[in-house]
Structures are given as structure tokens and as C-alpha cells.
């Protein structure tokens, strides 16, 4: 019984991670076309500030999903 619950939870985490990654990329492509040339010229090692914040957001969401899964699994096992 717990095996099925854990499998479904892991599957839902993968779906939410892939959905958040897709929206982060879509947000990046839509905002990158509207930035000015002076902003693009202020790159650090080839990564613009927009890429940096999008990447940090995705990492934060992945960490949040992992911690939430651990807490939910430990709550279900009790």
C-alpha cells in the first residue's frame, strides 16, 4: 500500500518539476525579447541576469518539491 502511495507522490513531483521548468523557460523566452541592448551587454560569463533568476527559481522549486515530498512521505508512514 505504501509503495503505491510513494510511487504516485514521486510521479506527481516529476510532473510538477517538469511543468515548472517549462514555465520558467517560457517566461525566459518571452522576457528576453523585450530587454534592451544595454542590459544584454551587462552579461557575466555569458549568463544574463534573467537566466540567473530563472535558474535560481527552478532550483528553489525543485528543493521545495523534494522537501515537501519527504515531509509528506514521513507523514504518510506514521
UniProtKB/Swiss-Prot annotation:
This protein is a minor sialoglycoprotein in human erythrocyte membranes. Residues 20-52 are extracellular. It is a single-pass type I membrane protein. Keywords: Glycoprotein, Membrane, Sialic acid, Signal, Transmembrane, Transmembrane helix. Residues 1-19 form the signal peptide. It is found in: Membrane. The gene is GYPE. The N-terminal extracellular domain is heavily glycosylated on serine and threonine residues. It comes from Homo sapiens (Human). This is Glycophorin-E. The chain crosses the membrane at residues 53-73. It comes from the Eukaryota. InterPro entries: Glycophorin. GO terms for cellular component: plasma membrane. Belongs to the glycophorin-A family. The keyword RNA-binding does not apply. Residues 74-78 are cytoplasmic.
